[in-house]
Regions:
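Conserved small/polar residues in nucleotide/adenosyl-binding loops
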Residues: 244-250
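An alpha-helical support segment within catalytic cores of ATP-dependent transferases
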Residues: 102-149, 153, 157-162, 166
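Short beta-strand micro-motifs within the conserved protein kinase catalytic domain, predominantly
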Residues: 54-63
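Conserved HxN/HPN-centered segment at the entrance to the catalytic loop
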Residues: 47-55
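Conserved short submotifs of the Hanks-type protein kinase catalytic core
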Residues: 62-73
Length: 252
């Protein structure tokens, strides 16, 4: 029996017989569906323990992707249920991110190339700002670490005990996965946490502090990526425009 987990105009997700199937609307671009499946399989090939891709199919003109189903709440749901454990949850979130960033797949899209195209396509930014952003982007170090691209509590599935202690953790929705600089992915998640929890929440700061502490990374280095990922994210979320100012005045 199908159990629907989510429904929208463009896609729906249901669980049946231990498998999760994402069904896309007939109007959904076929190449986007196939790209999502390809990216997921490339993350698997990199050795990351994620729900495995099982099938790509088309039924009645609707494309679908079927994967293993991992039962459990999202990290967002766990934070809402056990707010007093948020610090531990954020640390677990960072530890898992660090673990998959140690992996890589040379077939994944290069993050800096993707961001270059995104920034160039943004109509909200004038050419002088674009030039400054692209100059900084080109100066950033080239890495090949696995970056999720949309790593946030809504895309993290956990297994927890009766007291809310996390036993296992995994991530889903790897369609935006790339190879690139780990700090860029951290800056992107920091922005997503800001958009999700708001400026008054201390969760974003605790997240970025945990990463810097666990990896011995300077906060200033992660900060250099903030206006870049904020600008790139404008192609998906117009709310991100309020964060492009984070370090823009210091761009030289």
């Amino acid at each position: 029996m199908k159990k629907y987990l989510a429904k929208s105009k463009l896609k729906s997700v249901y669980v049946e017989n231990g498998k999760a199937t994402k069904v896309f609307a007939k109007t959904y671009n076929k190449s986007d569906v196939l790209y999502e499946a390809l990216n997921t399989s490339r993350v698997e090939d990199a050795g990351v323990n994620i729900p495995k891709l099982l099938e790509v199919a088309v039924t009645d003109g609707k494309w679908s992707i079927t994967s293993e189903y991992v039962e459990g709440p999202t990290l967002t749901q766990l934070i809402e249920k056990y707010p007093d454990k948020a610090d531990d949850y954020i640390k677990k979130m960072v530890e898992y991110q660090i673990s998959f960033q140690k992996k890589s797949n040379p077939l994944l899209l290069v993050l800096k190339d993707k961001m270059n195209r995104q920034i160039n396509s943004i109509e909200e930014l004038d050419n002088s700002v674009k030039y400054e952003l692209l100059t900084r982007l080109n100066s950033m170090k080239n890495h090949t670490k696995l970056c999720h691209g949309d790593y946030c509590p809504d895309n993290i599935i956990v297994t927890a005990d009766a007291k809310g202690n996390i036993k296992e953790i995994t991530a889903v929705d790897w369609v935006h996965a790339t190879q690139g600089n780990a700090s860029a992915d951290i800056a992107n998640t920091f922005l997503l946490l800001k958009l999700q929890f708001g400026d008054k929440s201390d969760i974003p700061e605790k997240y970025i502090s945990a990463f810097c502490e666990l990896t011995n990374t300077k906060r200033s280095y992660v900060n250099e990526w903030l206006p870049l990922v904020a600008a790139a994210r404008l192609t998906k979320n117009k709310e991100a425009v309020s964060y492009t100012h984070l370090t823009l005045p210091t761009i030289a």
